[in-house]
């Protein structure tokens, strides 16, 4: 009946690939665009924007080059009338057949580092000191916890 349907509120999910009409098999995205998409969809939700920054840092330091546009998803919650960044998934050490990140970091797909990570964060409106601190925290954590697997 109607009351049961009202109690069963569904969440919709869309990937960055679907939202931006991208072929996830082709490198066609930069984290600048992912940060902008996250800010727009989540109405500049600080938690989600910072989370996207952390994912970018993790993908760089953990050598997850399979960071294509279908691996970034947003969930719409009808009850709150709001899009949110989904929990992270498909986070694993990986190369691509062309040897670069599928999503570039400030234009660098081959060997992005702290400079590019911070540039993306700052352009997204975060303080440089925050970006540097978070990038270093994630680098140290990945090195400490995943060192054996990243050799």
Q: Which residues make up each language-model segment?
A:
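Long, non-coiled-coil amphipathic alpha-helical linker/lever segments
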Residues: 23-26, 124
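A glycine-rich phosphate-binding loop feature that marks nucleotide/adenosyl-phosphate handling sites
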Residues: 3, 72-79, 136-139
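Conserved kinase catalytic-core segment
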Residues: 29-97
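Mobile late-domain/C-terminal helix-loop "cap" segments
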Residues: 109-151
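Short beta-alpha connecting loops at secondary-structure transitions
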Residues: 98-107
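Single conserved hydrophobic/aromatic residue that forms the stacking wall/gate
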Residues: 1-9
């Amino acid at each position: 009946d109607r009351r049961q349907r009202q109690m069963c509120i569904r969440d919709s999910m869309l990937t960055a690939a679907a939202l931006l009409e991208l072929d996830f098999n082709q490198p066609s995205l930069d984290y600048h665009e992912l940060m902008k998409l996250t800010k727009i969809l989540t109405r500049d939700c600080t938690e989600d924007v910072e989370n996207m920054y952390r994912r970018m840092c993790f993908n760089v330091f953990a050598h997850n080059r399979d960071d294509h546009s279908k691996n970034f998803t947003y969930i719409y919650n009808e009850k709150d009338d709001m899009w949110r960044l989904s929990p992270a998934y498909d986070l694993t050490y990986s190369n691509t057949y062309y040897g670069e990140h599928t999503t570039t970091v400030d234009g660098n797909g081959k060997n992005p580092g702290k400079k590019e990570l911070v540039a993306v964060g700052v352009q997204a409106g975060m303080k440089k000191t925050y970006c540097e601190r978070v990038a270093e925290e994630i680098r140290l954590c990945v090195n400490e916890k995943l060192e054996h697997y990243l050799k």
